């Protein structure tokens, strides 16, 4: 399977935004890439869901169930949200859906929920899913204070499991910077021996930010 698995160091770090930018950049370069969200939870009615945003960025006509096989109401990790609804997430089912997408498209960008060790099923985490799919993992992290520890821990967890690290992206998710922001890329590189691919700029205009992220990431990430 050709593609990327996108994980985060936390929730709210911009995984969907980065995944959509990668998809748009890939399609602009002529690559038929499609997004996938194995499970989404806590969708706010009236707002586009992560799966809908990924499908739009993929510019495809896939049904939402083919993009996201599991949707839950509660804003919890997939395994916990499933328990509340008396349901179960099946790793085998998620892998089956991903492989079906891969058979119809040239590449798949799989966006996980939360971080790498967030429980996907009653027994497996998103790290297990990344391993089952055999995809390199792109780590999306916040740019500010605390990100050095979170990012280093995520990279260490990936390496201990023998999972390929596609890169690290530091994402500014708001206009405010703290004094650590310009220093964090070098600290992360020193601790992980991996130079972050990009420190993404903040841009309040959504359309302009999408174009900016696509341009930056498209030039630096190949899959």
From Swiss-Prot:
It is found in: Cytoplasm. GO terms for biological process: biotin biosynthetic process. Belongs to the dethiobiotin synthetase family. Its main location: cytoplasm. Keywords: ATP-binding, Biotin biosynthesis, Cytoplasm, Ligase, Magnesium, Metal-binding, Nucleotide-binding. Mg(2+) binds at residues 16, 50, 111. Its EC number is 6.3.3.3. Homodimer. Catalyzes a mechanistically unusual reaction, the ATP-dependent insertion of CO2 between the N7 and N8 nitrogen atoms of 7,8-diaminopelargonic acid (DAPA, also called 7,8-diammoniononanoate) to form a ureido ring. It catalyses: (7R,8S)-7,8-diammoniononanoate + CO2 + ATP = (4R,5S)-dethiobiotin + ADP + phosphate + 3 H(+). GO terms for cellular component: cytosol. Pfam families: AAA_26. Pathway: Cofactor biosynthesis; biotin biosynthesis; biotin from 7,8-diaminononanoate: step 1/2. This is ATP-dependent dethiobiotin synthetase BioD. One of its GO terms (molecular function) is magnesium ion binding. Substrate binds at residue 41.
């Amino acid at each position: 399977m050709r593609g990327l698995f996108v994980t985060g160091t936390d929730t709210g770090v911009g995984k969907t935004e980065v995944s959509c930018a990668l998809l748009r950049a890939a399609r602009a370069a002529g690559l038929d890439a499609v997004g996938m969200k194995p499970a989404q939870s806590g969708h706010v009615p009236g707002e586009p869901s992560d799966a809908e945003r990924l499908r739009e960025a993929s510019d495809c006509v896939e049904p939402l169930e083919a993009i996201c096989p599991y949707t839950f109401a509660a804003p919890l990790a997939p395994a916990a949200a499933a328990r509340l609804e008396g349901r179960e997430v099946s790793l085998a089912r998620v892998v089956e859906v991903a492989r079906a997408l891969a058979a119809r498209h040239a590449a798949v960008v799989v966006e996980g929920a939360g971080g790498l060790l967030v429980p996907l099923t009653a027994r497996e985490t998103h790290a297990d899913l990344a391993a089952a799919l055999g995809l390199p993992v792109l780590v999306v992290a916040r740019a500010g204070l605390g990100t050095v520890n979170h990012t280093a821990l995520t990279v260490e967890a990936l390496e201990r499991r023998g999972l390929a690290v596609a890169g690290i992206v530091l994402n500014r998710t708001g206009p405010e910077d703290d004094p650590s922001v310009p220093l964090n890329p070098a600290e992360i590189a020193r601790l992980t021996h991996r130079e972050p691919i990009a420190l993404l700029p903040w841009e309040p205009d959504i359309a302009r930010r999408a174009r900016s992220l696509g341009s930056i990431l498209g030039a630096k990430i190949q899959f």
